[in-house]
Amino acid sequence: MEEDDNLKKGNERNKKKAIFSNDDFTGEDSLMEDHLELREKLSEDIDMIKTSLKNNLVCSTLNDNEILTLSNYMQFFVFKSGNLVIKQGEKGSYFFIINSGKFDVYVNDKKVKTMGKGSSFGEAALIHNTQRSATIIAETDGTLWGVQRSTFRATLKQLSNRNFNENRTFIDSVSVFDMLTEAQKNMITNACVIQNFKSGETIVKQGDYGDVLYILKEGKATVYINDEEIRVLEKGSYFGERALLYDEPRSATIIAKEPTACASICRKLLNIVLGNLQVVLFRNIMTEALQQSEIFKQFSGDQLNDLADTAIVRDYPANYNILHKDKVKSVKYIIVLEGKVELFLDDTSIGILSRGMSFGDQYVLNQKQPFKHTIKSLEVCKIALITETCLADCLGNNNIDASIDYNNKKSIIKKMYIFRYLTDKQCNLLIEAFRTTRYEEGDYIIQEGEVGSRFYIIKNGEVEIVKNKKRLRTLGKNDYFGERALLYDEPRTASVISKVNNVECWFVDKSVFLQIIQGPMLAHLEERIKMQDTKVEMDELETERIIGRGTFGTVKLVHHKPTKIRYALKCVSKRSIINLNQQNNIKLEREITAENDHPFIIRLVRTFKDSKYFYFLTELVTGGELYDAIRKLGLLSKSQAQFYLGSIILAIEYLHERNIVYRDLKPENILLDKQGYVKLIDFGCAKKVQGRAYTLVGTPHYMAPEVILGKGYGCTVDIWALGICLYEFICGPLPFGNDEEDQLEIFRDILTGQLTFPDYVTDTDSINLMKRLLCRLPQGRIGCSINGFKDIKDHPFFSNFNWDKLAGRLLDPPLVSKSETYAEDIDIKQIEEEDAEDDEEPLNDEDNWDIDF
């Protein structure tokens, strides 16, 4: 019964709409100007304000200093008996605390309660510009403390930025973090926890085992060793860094000399966010050293990571022969992780290597060459040794030249759309199928007008592209040509002629390619290339029907009259964009959508504009919404959930690699193509982020806690939304606020509600992944560590899942629509009538804001 009830709840939920917070001037702002009075806050005022703010949902995670800062921004308002304070249905922008008097609350013109001193109202207005759920009128003369949303959220942003920058400065000063990357240091900064100590309170005690690093942000602390005062630490000092690396007793006692605040980092949280610090530091050193090598810099990133993982790390005392020319057997390369070593050739010193330096390129390139050097430690040191076995395990063989050759081919073909999403197996088969051919100066490699069947990559030399006897350009090493011949039987559009002697090319024949690439992937590639090749103008499009409708306009099914190729045309009303102040968002949506190039993300063909609309011409996706699909399927099986969640992960991972946060992930924004594979659509909420974003945007039920709290967020918010989607797939309803329409109550449940699971959900791996995706602390959320999506892909939930086959379209989707399915089917005449009405009102447009559209 519980399963049926929850399935019913999930099926009955309405489609959820995104919200955009903005700080436009409202009627409420105008009203408050008439009641504002200047008044200095007394200590009892500040105490009351602080108490009220601490009980406020949005302020629940703020520390005392942040609460005090916000208190200082509260303004004083005076009302006479009968004065209106806020009105039900109007957009709100203030949060209030009653200082004196009584205020009546009305819902739908019915009085429901009276509030007095210390009570607060308008909490939702601090989050975004939602409509007021009640009217409040002064019953008696009274006064309020109030703060405007824009001031409140700007203050939160300022406090958050200041705190992050200050903590990051402290992190930069800790020597143990010197070898970390910028991204890794930012991860640690986000993991900092502020701890306050009273004067005389012990921070760490000599002899105790510790796992926390402390950095003094405020105050002073005294260091004692064996009860003897050694020194006083001040702001910026740090202690306990060895606790992050080693499990050993504290070497001193440290006591707060005055009220002291410390930024603290514990080993457990650091391991979650970054991994074992010592391992990370050594891996960074090894990777950087390998990238400096003339040999290893030609390896792929994955191969370098594998080498770092398989390298043997050893400690050596001072004055020790680490490698002797007469005794070395399998070691081919060394990297100094700590300390210094001296390098000898024929007993003559030829140099000193310190941390981060490496040696051995010649022995890697020619592994049969005897080791002629001796390496001796000058001090205690730690060395990474790369052996023949390490190289063989990493590369699959000991032939370095062949491996570099393979890497070159792979890096070239992965740049091309038709090869980019091949499975590893398909990619390997394709590369193995390449053959080598040579040409002399003046030889025709391909002839204009002939039907081609080969694809070429230039291994060495130069060729000329000639069309109608006119030289167009010259191609050189690692350039390619003729790829269309693998998909289409069509004449070559130009000739390719060898420019010099001994031009070497790798080539593969169409017959071989078609043996490797078959079925859904081949069909997908053919359609994608054909769509991109077609040149489309607005007047060449003819509308067939309306297939979607939203806040800003409609989506039409159109066809290109010359070629009959069908597309989707998203028509966005300029009036709606201007009225809702979304000019920057629509420009950003165009920029992001134009750059996207992934099989699980909607493909933009081009954009148009006229006096009334912006137009996005995209590929046509005919399989309906995932929202409807999961209702047809019922509660998803594990394999079905793996398919859909895995597909969404690949799309979101692609965006995050480009520093794009999507911010509105939900089944309504995912379509299914005719093969049953996903397409992520609608980038109206997406944003490119370098640091952190602060705007409240997205669909409330899918919003991460950090979006609501207003202290800054990044790509972690999409990981939270993955957890909401997975819960919906497996459990039925939404995990937070499923039965709520009041946005404040939805937000309250997201921030404080308990995550529970129906009794019929028994798979422990599924439950564990949902819990870890829906971790309220972003730094503890799976997928948000330095490993990124790898941690999610490696989770036991996906233990039997083939990611390679998913990317290669070799899996059977849970649902393939038997006919074309769209979100809407609206009569075209109805839309045309509305468009005609639109002409009657002039646009309040800004000059040239859309000039680049």
Swiss-Prot record:
Domain notes: The cNMP-binding domains 1, 2 and 4 bind preferentially cGMP. The cNMP-binding domain 4 binds cGMP with the highest affinity and is highly selective for cGMP. The cNMP-binding domain 3 does not bind cGMP but is required for cGMP-dependent catalytic activity. The cNMP-binding domains 1, 2 and 4 can bind cAMP but with less affinity. The autoinhibitory segment (AIS) interacts with the active site and inhibits catalytic activity.
Cited function: Serine/threonine protein kinase which acts as a downstream effector of the second messenger cGMP. Controls the release of Ca(2+) from intracellular stores by regulating phosphoinositide biosynthesis. Ca(2+) signals are essential for merozoite and sporozoite invasion and egress from host hepatocytes and erythrocytes, and, in the mosquito vector, for gametocyte activation, and ookinete and sporozoite motility. During the host liver stage, regulates the initial invasion of host hepatocytes by sporozoites by regulating sporozoite motility and microneme exocytosis.
Organism whose genome encodes this protein: Plasmodium falciparum (isolate 3D7)
Record domain AGC-kinase C-terminal: where: 799-853
Segments for region (Autoinhibitory segment): 1-29
Entry keyword set: ATP-binding, cGMP, cGMP-binding, Cytoplasm, Endoplasmic reticulum, Kinase, Magnesium, Membrane, Metal-binding, Nucleotide-binding, Phosphoprotein, Serine/threonine-protein kinase, Transferase
Protein's name according to its UniProt entry: cGMP-dependent protein kinase
Principal location class: cytoplasm
Gene designation per UniProt: PKG
MF terms (GO), sorted A to Z: ATP binding; cAMP-dependent protein kinase activity; cGMP binding; cGMP-dependent protein kinase activity; metal ion binding; protein serine kinase activity
Occurrences of domain Protein kinase (ranges): 541-798
Activity regulation details: Activated by cGMP. Not activated by cAMP. cGMP binding allosterically triggers a conformational change at the alpha C-helix of cGMP-binding domain 4, which bridges the regulatory and catalytic domains, causing the capping triad, composed of Arg-484, Gln-532 and Asp-533, to form and stabilize the active conformation. The cGMP-binding domains acts cooperatively to activate PKG.
Similarity field: Belongs to the protein kinase superfamily. AGC Ser/Thr protein kinase family. cGMP subfamily.
A GO cellular component annotation in the UniProt record: cytoplasm
InterPro entries: AGC-kinase_C (IPR000961), cGMP_dep_kinase (IPR002374), cNMP-bd_CS (IPR018488), cNMP-bd_dom (IPR000595), cNMP-bd_dom_sf (IPR018490), Kinase-like_dom_sf (IPR011009), Prot_kinase_dom (IPR000719), Protein_kinase_ATP_BS (IPR017441)
SMART domains: cNMP (SM00100), S_TKc (SM00220)
